[in-house]
């Protein structure tokens, strides 16, 4: 008989927040898309994880489960109230996953941006009571359990952002793997409105390499270690073209198409997840001001006009 507490690695006195964090961690571990070579077992485990979350996150279901086990949930036996005699119906594991992550890639930049806005607006939060035009916010890995495995430090993950009249304008994070400071990932993203157009800039610094790109509807520039990179620019344009050509909003298929790509960094031992709807790189942050940066941007823009993305 399955033990839902054991499935999520929880004690029986676990709080609702503990249950949600545990689901985040275990669901990502057993997601079928992350286990293509062991998909049958992964699907079974993924289903158990979803069921465990549905039961333990619901006070009524959890109370019945604690008293009578899965038999009580299935409507069997004679030890539970008549009002529950018909049992419960579980949702599809994928539906539970989407509901928890709000149909967003759990490792995407937008996921963290939205989560931080939720933090600011949370009832009783000291952040939510501050002036939104000038407020700064900080958080640690305890707020986002998906980063816990990256760090052996109590404050291994830290984010900082600022809120202006346009809303959330920047977000940055830093994560270390357990092998030490030599292998790390730093990601930064920013959005700003310029002449009515949204400019999205993203940057990733992984160990000793920095990649940066700017997008205002079309790829504007692509830099590697602050130097224009034609190969990277071409690959990014190619990826976007292929993604656009392969996308059809009216097409349907009975086959399962993965929404998420689980990427392993062999050198750093770090697992990362990207959305198949987003570019396969983590591009970007903007360095404020500087004649050198402006000069490079102009040079890359001239080159980009010669290409058709």
Curated annotation (Swiss-Prot):
Q: Which Pfam families match?
A: DnaJ
Segment Disordered: which positions?
282-309
Residue stretches of biased makeup (Basic residues): 290-309
Q: Which GO terms describe its biological process?
A: chaperone-mediated protein folding
Q: List the disulfide bonds.
A: none
InterPro entries named among the record's database cross-references? DnaJ_domain, DnaJ_domain_CS, DNJB2/6-like, J_dom_sf
Q: Which UniProt keywords apply?
A: Chaperone
Q: Which GO terms describe its molecular function?
A: Hsp70 protein binding; protein folding chaperone; protein-folding chaperone binding; unfolded protein binding
> Which cellular component, as a GO term, is one annotated location?
cytoplasm
Q: Where is the J domain?
A: 3-69
Q: Which residues form a coiled coil?
A: none
Biological role stated in the UniProt entry: Probably acts as a co-chaperone.
Protein name, entry field: DnaJ homolog subfamily B member 7
- Native source organism of the sequence: Homo sapiens (Human)
């Amino acid at each position: 008989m399955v033990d839902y507490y054991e499935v999520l690695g929880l004690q029986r006195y676990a709080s609702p927040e503990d249950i949600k964090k545990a689901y985040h961690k275990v669901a990502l571990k057993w997601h079928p898309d992350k286990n293509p070579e062991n998909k049958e077992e992964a699907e079974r485990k993924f289903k158990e994880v979803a069921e465990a979350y549905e039961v333990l996150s619901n006070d009524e279901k959890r109370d019945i489960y604690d008293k009578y086990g899965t038999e009580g949930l299935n409507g069997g036996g004679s030890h539970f109230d008549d009002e529950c005699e018909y049992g419960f119906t579980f949702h599809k594991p994928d539906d539970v996953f989407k509901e928890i992550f709000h149909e967003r890639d759990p490792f995407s930049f937008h996921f963290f941006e939205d989560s931080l806005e939720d933090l600011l607006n949370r009832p009783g939060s000291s952040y939510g009571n501050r002036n939104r035009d000038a407020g700064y916010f900080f958080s640690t890995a305890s707020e986002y359990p998906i980063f816990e495995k990256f760090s052996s430090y109590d404050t291994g993950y830290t984010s900082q952002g600022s809120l202006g009249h346009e809303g959330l304008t920047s977000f940055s994070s830093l994560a270390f793997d357990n092998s030490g400071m030599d292998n790390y990932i730093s990601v930064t993203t920013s959005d700003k409105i310029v002449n009515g157009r949204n400019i999205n800039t993203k940057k990733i610094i992984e160990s000793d390499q920095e990649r940066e790109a700017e997008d205002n509807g079309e790829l504007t520039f692509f830099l590697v270690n602050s130097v224009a990179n034609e190969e990277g620019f071409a690959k990014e344009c190619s990826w976007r073209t292929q993604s656009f050509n392969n996308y059809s909003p009216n097409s349907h298929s009975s086959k399962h198409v993965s929404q998420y790509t689980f990427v392993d960094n062999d050198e750093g031992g770090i697992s990362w997840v990207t959305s198949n709807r987003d570019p396969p790189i983590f591009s970007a942050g903007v360095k404020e001001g500087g004649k050198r940066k402006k000069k490079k941007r102009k040079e890359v823009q001239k080159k980009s006009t010669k290409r058709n993305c």
